[in-house]
């Protein structure tokens, strides 16, 4: 008897989602949440059965970039990648996952090739519609943890296509979404991401992890070593949710106090892209040597002006290290050191006098500080500033049916436990 791979996948998803809930909730709490999620999925699936498209118009492409939501497209986070793929002569279309109500209203649904339990019928039918509508050779998935991914992979396999998941950051955080691993290829930034995924106790599906580097970084981060004589500190701000917390207000206050006591230093503040920087707006009005950088100032441009970077809790510390800037971590929030900054840059700074001593240490042994940044960047970013070119080359090879370059490290990431 031939097994139905779609139904097998659906049953495995049930097991996976139950285990995800049990990681955070009691047996009763997990059961209630599981039932609530199942009811919502079942209702979507039931309605989807009556909203199937009578026919599917074809809008084919070589690459289909599937973003997590329509609003994400406007952020243009994949601009370099899109331009690179199109620059190589391929037809790339960019679209986004729609909410269930839109999928139902617009009949973006096609009956899956095999029977699927009602709970997952809506997801499977939309995945089938996407593949039949666009007929991509390679589908580039952006959303971590998407429950559509397993069905996209099945639909693509039936038509000779591939599902490639593009990590849009290092995968070192503890987000439950990173348990999804059901892709043909999983493009990772570097060694730290691979180690973090291998250490996870819950992985759904299998994939071939490829250390391609970051497709979001170009050679703008290749710059001369900083001039310590400029005495310019760049502070990387935290996200708008975190910066409201008292511990991060205290961290900001520590840095602002230090800046007031050291007018010989120029202090630049690069806010998080989503932050309005309310704390620093007040500081710059009262402190002449503090400058709040505007949204039009790129991270690379900010790093060019900096001699030392102060990081609190920002992914941008990786770009700072790649740019060859010494890094100091200042944090009163007590967050887990997910980037392993202490391993490379020393203990977290929690007082003004510590910051002063560490700056003196950088001035005393500048070569060591640069070596620490180089090692940190290599740990997190394969191929350094060449990540975009590496990613484009890998995508071209996959599209053309060729093997990946021997220079790329590939590792099989199996499901864990094995029944997922």
List PLM regions with ranges.
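Hydrophobic/aromatic beta-strand patches that form the interior of the parallel beta-sheet core
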Residues: 91-93, 140, 164, 185-187, ...
